């Protein structure tokens, strides 16, 4: 009985120390570096002629569209799109029914990428998690996910 008390005390002390262990901290810079490395490997493996912009978003203009619209946060964009994870899993799709959004209300990756095209244009965006949903999960999108979007801009106003 006496040994059992010491054993239980030892378990309690060990549990207390384990509970005090510091959680691993999230590092946006380290995650961004990891995302960039993964995107570069993906575009190389899939022969995608993507360009990396100054923010770190990779894009491929499939069709530039026409016009000379100047975008702002209040710009309304009507888009047909499909969103995928790098493993090919589709997490969102407008299914040929264009949807209208305010540009400033969209994820940063879209705010950065959509202005590269004009009405009628089509773009592929490979978005590091920092410019997507970051360290939080969103629906079927896991935390720290790189996003792969193909977007057709059907209207802009």
Give names to the regions the model predicted.
Residues 2-6, 16-157:
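Cross-family detector of peptidyl-prolyl cis-trans isomerase
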